[in-house]
Amino acid sequence: MQEVAEQSYDAMEAYIMTRDLVNEKINEEVTKLNANQKIFANKYNIQIGEDTSELGKKMKLSNEVFENHTQLYLIFFKVNFTESVLLKAIESNDISAIQQNSNALEQYSNEGMEKLKTFQPYKNDMSLVLATKKMLEFTKKEALELSPSVISFSMLNQKFQESKKTMDNKAANSRSKEEIDNFNKLVNEVNKEVGNYNKTINKFNIDRSNTINNWNVTSENFIARYIPFE
């Protein structure tokens, strides 16, 4: 599972690198265009206004903003994707996969926090940095609190199902008092824990939705604040 997360991250990184190369090529062509315009203007004594290189200025500014944004997006993407794989493991009740992806999520959350320590925000705008930090804090909390809770409940439920199967396979008159008492105790324990489990799941679902939505909105606002769309 961790290998899948790494491959997806590498694919996203490769896509972004390709996009950046395309933008770089466009910048080169815009620079050439501006240079040729100046040569032509000088040759024929044509006055070129300041706005002739406006496209080049906008492209340069856009690239600076997107380059800064991309660094934070890659940090966000890595934990967001790993989190989605973890949630699928939880949904399928795969304890081994839950543990593996939980470990990976904690690792990527810590790595992201370290990257943020040396990250240089664009124009000292900390909005997206803080939104990314909030996401990393949440995913680490998922790894350290949600996953153990899910594993604990899954193991308890598995124990209950095995005990129920054993009891169902026995005739009522062949069940010992100790077996009945132990099974009833297990039933009470499951009934108690299922409520706590559902509360935990619901809380993390709400927090996850709010955290991701906050990152997306902050991301859109960050780009809109600095990219010249006109």
Segments from the language model and where they lie:
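C-terminal amphipathic alpha-helix
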Residues: 3-102, 156-230
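Short, solvent-exposed, charged loop/turn and helix-capping segments
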Residues: 1-2, 112-136, 148-155
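Amphipathic, well-ordered alpha-helical segments in soluble domains
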Residues: 75-82, 108-115, 142
